Amino acid sequence: MQREVELFLKAYPSVEMIEALITDCNGVARGKWIPRGKIQSILDDGLKLPKSALGLDIWGRDIPELAHANGDIDGYCMAVEDSLKPVLTPRGTDQGQLIMTMVDETGAPYMGDPRQILAKVLEGFSERNLKPCMAAELEFYLLPDPGRDKPLRESLDSLDTLGGNLYALNELDHHSEMLDLLRETFKTQDLPYEGIIKELSLIHISE
């Protein structure tokens, strides 16, 4: 992976920090910030995180039975191939991202890692000469800023609760600055981008 790092650092000279992240059982990203000079060592040797980091509750708190019963031993987080990507921030592309997956001390997949569980499921399909295909849709709501020290409820009360104007292009144009930034973020990380539509609710958008 040395060539991968060299090409990345050359293409993004402003990157000073990398998010080395792994996804826990709730789909929340956990991990460490890694300085630019440590990227190669992380790709070569991985990094340690407690195995219990993948079993936190949704609030990020330890589950005592997981964290303390075995002394909260470490797992080894190894880089997922081709996952070193730039991250678009308000300052530009001055940050990177590296997706990790956890193995145990023998190098075997740690089955508390959702990514490893999914890999095992895919193995079953492969053994049957099957290839699952899927499409992901990101749905979200855009809410007015209620202002400092004001409850969000005030913004909701001001909205037209009837909604409507389904698939309206002018509604997308109204939020074009934010939606253009979203599109650029997808492009920066080489993520598939098929388009955006306005849903039925006044503030409901789908990508």
Give each language-model segment a name.
Residues G195-L202:
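Active-site-proximal, well-structured secondary-structure segments within enzyme catalytic domains
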Residues M1-G195:
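ATP/Mg2+-dependent ligation/transfer catalytic cores
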